[in-house]
UniProtKB/Swiss-Prot annotation:
This is RING-H2 finger protein ATL48. It comes from Arabidopsis thaliana (Mouse-ear cress). The chain crosses the membrane at residues 21-41, 55-75, 121-141. Pathway: Protein modification; protein ubiquitination. Belongs to the RING-type zinc finger family. ATL subfamily. The lineage of its organism: Eukaryota, Viridiplantae, Streptophyta, Embryophyta, Tracheophyta. Keywords: Acetylation, Membrane, Metal-binding, Transferase, Transmembrane, Transmembrane helix, Ubl conjugation pathway, Zinc, Zinc-finger. Its main location: membrane.
Length: 349
């Protein structure tokens, strides 16, 4: 038997050296797609991660199918097992007769059509790999095309006339994905000192962004489109990633925020002070400011709608719900004037 087995190894020497290349190739492709999907999920791109996970399942299934389909060509030769079983039955034969019997059985059992089957397996394997590759490319292209429709351009031209000003919440829903305003547009918004506008009031108002009270030395930035004002650093940080008012969600476009002023400060005007129609009207531009404060939602309805509150002004004009608190906007407007020249940045009356 010892002389028979070397002969068998010589007969199947070429088959023994052949290894299935689809096993490492499929494993490498599956691992690569899986790694890319995990990286996408970690970076917050869930849509691309889902596409890559689906592609991983397709690649893994195709790899298993190819391994099963090419098992005849790359796997163990069934004729070898059959010959070994028949050789064991003829152990009484001499080595020479065993070798002759082996050659006879090989000529009988191994048909010439095996080469055709091998070629067909290779062709099918190549076509399957091409189909898998094209499928992955199609999924990636479909995702990129969907992303381009959802996020066409980071900076879009917004026309405020297309939407009603009475529905700022609806405007915000249509423009959920924006990249905020440029720093130059933010700097063009007017700035004023809180203490100069509310000099006669005792109880301070609150900032709707940081939820803290205003102090007399705080600088506030005004949004002229809605007349709401916030802390300078609070609203600047907000507008870098959002192009809407944080309180009423009204959209801010380049046309209604740029005034060609740099580092401007607003000079306060009392409610009874009139702006002259001559030279003064050309030098300053009057704006109204709406401020408010937070009230707990646990308070009764009558307490929130008193005719006069602690500071002696009518509250509220409008109420904005913020979790367990409500932001009540004062019914009284504070009038301020914007200097038309950047050099007139000092506060004055």
């Amino acid at each position: 038997m010892s002389s028979v087995e070397p002969d068998m190894e010589d007969l199947f020497q070429e088959k023994k050296r052949v290894r299935n290349p689809l096993v490492p190739l499929g494993a490498l492709m599956t691992a690569g797609v899986l790694t890319a999907g995990l990286i996408s999920f970690r970076r917050g791109n869930s849509q691309l991660g889902q596409v890559l996970m689906r592609a991983r399942v397709v690649v893994q299934g195709a790899t298993v199918a190819l391994m099963v389909g090419t098992g005849y060509y790359y796997g163990d030769n069934p004729w070898k097992k059959l010959l070994l079983s028949e050789i064991h039955e003829t152990e009484a034969l001499s080595p020479k007769s065993s070798s002759a019997a082996t050659l006879t059985l090989m000529n009988q059992k191994d048909p010439s059509s095996s080469s055709i089957v091998s070629v067909l397996c290779l062709v099918i394997s190549g076509l399957a790999l091409i189909i898998v590759f094209l499928g992955v490319l199609y999924l990636i292209f479909k995702f990129l095309r969907k992303s381009s429709t959802l996020f066409p351009i980071p900076h879009f031209n917004y026309n405020p006339d297309l939407f009603s000003f009475s529905s700022p919440q609806l405007q915000h829903l249509f423009f959920l994905h924006d990249s905020g305003l440029d720093q130059t547009a933010i700097d063009a918004l007017p700035v004023f000192l809180y203490g100069n506008v509310t000099i006669s009031l005792e109880q301070p108002f609150d900032c709707a962004v940081c939820l803290n009270e205003f102090s007399d030395t705080d600088k506030l930035r005004l949004l002229p489109v809605c007349s709401h004002a916030f802390h300078l650093h609070c609203i600047d940080t907000w507008l870098l990633s959002n192009s809407t008012c944080p309180l009423c969600r009204r959209s801010l476009s380049t046309s209604n925020v740029c005034y060609n002023h740099s580092e401007t400060l607003v000079a306060p005007l009392s409610g009874h002070q009139q702006v002259d129609d001559g030279k003064a009207s050309l030098a300053k531009r009057v704006f109204s400011v709406r401020l408010g404060r937070f009230k707990s939602t646990n308070e009764s309805q009558s307490q929130r709608h008193d005719v006069k509150d602690e500071i002696g002004v009518r509250m509220p004009r409008r109420c904005y719900s913020m979790g367990t608190q409500q932001y009540l906007v004062c019914d009284q407007d504070f009038v301020v004037a914007l200097s038309s020249s950047p050099r007139e940045g000092n506060i004055g009356r």
